[in-house]
Swiss-Prot record:
Part of the ESX-1 specialized secretion system, which delivers several virulence factors to host cells during infection, including the key virulence factors EsxA (ESAT-6) and EsxB (CFP-10). Residues 456-665 form the FtsK domain. It comes from Mycobacterium tuberculosis (strain ATCC 25618 / H37Rv). One of its GO terms (cellular component) is peptidoglycan-based cell wall. It is found in: Cell inner membrane. This is ESX-1 secretion system protein EccCa1. PANTHER family: SPORULATION PROTEIN RELATED, TYPE VII SECRETION SYSTEM PROTEIN ESSC.
């Protein structure tokens, strides 16, 4: 099976910061003190005295009464009311004071509500990113989020099961006595202000849980898991869980094995496409052996492991066993290290059980506990949806190899150059073949230049930056005289311009050994200039530094103007953002990538040492401005040139034959380039980042061109004329879950 190499990118995503909020309780109303005996009798005594005084005044005659005497009963009434008011309450707060405290406390809760609401929104966004809806998984395949969970990630071996209630990460802490809400003075609940107490209880119940939050199940916690209940719902949940695992975990860190009685069951046959179900080394006639078994013997190697430990990481990939037999995997209750068995069905012996209901909810059960609701909406995915995801993932692998078993054609060690760029003949390579790639197209700036000698695979140099899944943006090439360096550069440039429109890439070619490398390329519409060290172009060499500096400044100015034109807050961050606005319809002119190729840059730096500063600037800012640099030389020892400042930004290295092991190690980290023989012109090693060097052979395009005859395939060995070979008939095997046996070749 042919696969493309996929290098996982660790993505951080939204951040979640747990916190704690110490909730201030409502005020204490105080304890009512019962009145004393005197306080109880006093109102009656004062009432009797007032009545006696009125009786005396009436008996003595009203005419003899002074007006001031009439005020005395009124004064006594006022004194009695005041005494009653002062004697009641028993030390508690007055009503106006209680109302004021209540308003202040409700304002306090309103302020907290703003914080916890923002925290809840962040929590839902965090889990929505790391646990996207099953319908969004297909769009993640092929992006930098695919296989982005390393073994040390928090959610390594975790999968989404649905949405439901989650405890808020911003925990609400309440002061309590005996489990009840209490005031700061530890007064129990009955003595709290009742209205404020009611609101704080509602606040805790409302904001203590986050509703409709995506939920992840950490498989490493449990050795065995059973998913039962409604059969269709359980199967849909298991399908969604497996697809989530396959999209976010690379096959070298998570392996999926399947135990089933029907390997070609249409509801589960899609599993065979997952890279995680492919054996890393064993093959059959259809490619990698599928880890789909009908008997327990396929799991026998796992039984030799130690008991399951939730906190330990396996030495190899974590193994998820999908048991479709209802529990016949036969794993012991304590499980096995680095293994989780997920059984479809109500398997009572599992450590963790999920029971899916027809209404879409689900309950779960931990050991020695009863069932409780775990999701309000349980995930569900159809076999058709899963098949689309699995088939799309099948095109990727960690190594990007082509297995020998899948091909019954004679391996092509070298192919004519025009065939590699998609043409049947050189005559077909015309401007009509130029492509306008979208900015996110993986094939943009991906240049074929030869074949890997070990496998015969086509070799590409992807000069896009690493964030765009490329090997660039800057690199270095070394090769001594006769190594095929000039041939490599010509092949690289012609392959690029044969497939890419001039509006997407321009060239600035510099040759400091007389101009023979890029001879004739000044006629290409992609070429901005060809600069050599010929005497008549000496002034142009001196001006090249000014031209490149001006180009960097021009691109920065264009990004500032474009930012104002599209209404951005400031200058656009780079050409990538510029292209996004263009693809959305913004009226912006094309801003093609500038590919600067400098042959014999060591000679250039010896004559113009000030160029080292310019190259350093290109390496630093060229990434966002899309000015890509390739520095080529015969030797790093010419004139004592040192490029220490540039090396950290040179992300790909190419070494053809070198004169010493020191130069080979300086470029690709190994001495292998020194051992390339004189007869292997065009053979070299490509190293990208910290990966191992890959040996390749470039095309030979400087020889005479002969159109291929009908029915005959022309192979052009690097450094030699073409050879004619006929293609053998290919054998096609049906890709099944079960092993495909080898067939004897027919004479």
């Amino acid at each position: 099976m042919t696969t493309k190499k996929f290098t996982p990118t660790i993505t951080r995503g939204p951040r979640l910061t747990p916190g704690e909020i110490s909730l201030t309780p409502p005020d204490d109303l105080g304890i009512d003190i019962p009145p004393s005996g005197v306080q109880k009798i006093l109102p009656y005594v004062m009432g009797g005295a007032m009545l006696g005084m009125i009786a005396i005044m009436v008996a003595g005659g009203t005419r003899q009464l002074s007006p001031y005497m009439l005020m005395m009963p009124l004064m006594m009434i006022v004194m009695m009311v005041g005494g009653l008011a002062g004697s009641t309450g028993g030390g508690g707060k007055k009503v106006p004071e209680i109302n004021a405290d209540r308003k202040e406390y409700l304002r306090y809760l309103a302020g907290l509500r703003t914080r916890v609401t923002s925290s809840a929104t962040s929590q839902v966004a965090f889990f929505s990113y790391h646990a996207p809806h099953p319908e969004d998984l297909l769009s993640i395949v092929g992006t930098q989020r695919q296989w982005s969970r390393p073994a040390n990630a928090d959610f390594y071996a975790a999968t989404r099961i649905g949405i439901g209630d989650q405890p808020a990460v911003d925990r609400l802490l309440k002061p309590a006595v005996g489990g009840e809400l209490a005031a700061a003075s530890a007064a129990p609940q009955p003595f709290l202000e009742p209205v404020s107490h009611m609101w704080v209880v509602k606040f805790l119940r409302t904001h203590g849980l986050i509703h409709d939050c995506p939920k992840l199940l950490q498989l490493r916690t449990f050795p065995t898991i059973a998913i039962g209940g409604d059969l269709a719902g359980a199967a849909g949940l298991m399908t969604a869980m497996i697809c989530h695992l396959a999209v976010f975990h690379p096959p070298d860190l998570l392996q999926i094995r399947v135990l089933t009685e029907e390997p070609d069951d249409p509801d589960w046959s899609w599993l065979k496409w997952l890279p995680h179900v492919q054996h890393q080394t064993e093959t059959d006639a259809a490619g990698s052996t599928r880890l789909i078994f009908t008997r327990q013997e396929g799991l026998s190697d796992l039984a030799a492991r130690g008991p399951h430990a939730p906190d330990s990481l396996p030495g190899g990939p974590y193994v998820v066993v999908v048991d479709l037999t209802g529990g016949k995997a036969g794993f012991p209750p304590d499980g096995r290290a680095g293994v989780t068995v997920i059984t479809l069905g109500n398997h009572r012996g599992s450590a963790y059980r999920i029971r899916v209901h027809e209404d879409g909810t689900a309950d779960d059960r931990l050991p020695n506990q009863s069932f409780r609701q775990v999701t309000s909406v349980t995930d569900r995915m159809s076999p058709q949806q899963a098949s689309r995801i699995a088939r799309k993932l099948a095109g990727w692998s960690i190594t990007g190899t082509i297995l020998d078993k899948t091909s019954r054609v004679q391996k092509k060690v070298a192919t004519d150059w025009h065939q590699l760029v998609g043409a049947q003949s050189v005559e077909e390579i015309t401007p009509s073949r130029w492509r306008m790639y979208t900015d996110t197209d993986r094939d943009r700036l991906k240049i074929p230049f030869g074949h890997e000698l070990k496998t015969g695979n086509v070799m590409y140099l992807d000069i896009k930056e690493g964030a765009e899944f490329g090997a660039g943006p800057h690199g270095m090439l070394i090769g001594t005289t006769g190594s095929g360096k000039s041939e490599f550069l010509r092949t690289l440039i012609l392959s690029l311009v044969a497939m890419t429109h001039p509006d997407q890439v321009n060239l600035l070619l510099t040759d400091f050994k007389g101009g023979s490398t890029f001879l004739g390329m000044e006629k290409l519409p992609h070429t901005a200039a060809v600069v050599t060290n010929m005497a008549e172009e000496a002034e142009l060499v001196s001006r090249m530094g000014e031209v490149l500096t001006g180009e960097l400044d021009r691109r920065q100015s264009i990004l500032r103007q474009a930012g104002m034109k599209v209404g951005a807050a400031g200058a656009l961050s780079g050409v990538a953002e510029y292209e996004k606005y263009r693809e959305r319809g913004a009226d912006l002119p094309p801003l093609p990538t500038l590919f600067v190729v400098v042959d014999e840059f060591a000679e250039l730096l010896q004559s113009h040492p000030d160029f080292i500063g310019l190259f350093d600037r290109i390496c630093r800012v060229g990434r966002s401005l899309r000015v890509h640099l390739l520095l080529a030389t015969q030797s790093l020892q010419t004139g004592g040139v040192r490029i220490d400042k540039l090396e950290p930004n040179l992300t790909y290295r190419i070494a053809l034959r070198t004169t010493s092991s020191h130069e080979s190690k300086a470029v690709i980290g190994t001495p292998e380039a020194q051992y390339i023989t004189n007869k292997e012109s065009g053979v070299g090693f490509l190293r990208v980042g910290m990966e191992d060097p890959v040996k390749f052979s470039t095309f030979y395009i400087s020889g005479p061109y002969m159109p291929p005859a009908a029915g005959v395939e022309t192979n052009g060995e690097a450094g030699g004329p073409g050879q004619q070979t006929t293609r053998q008939a290919a054998r096609i095997h049906r890709f099944t879950a079960a092993p495909v046996l080898e067939e004897a070749p027919t004479p």
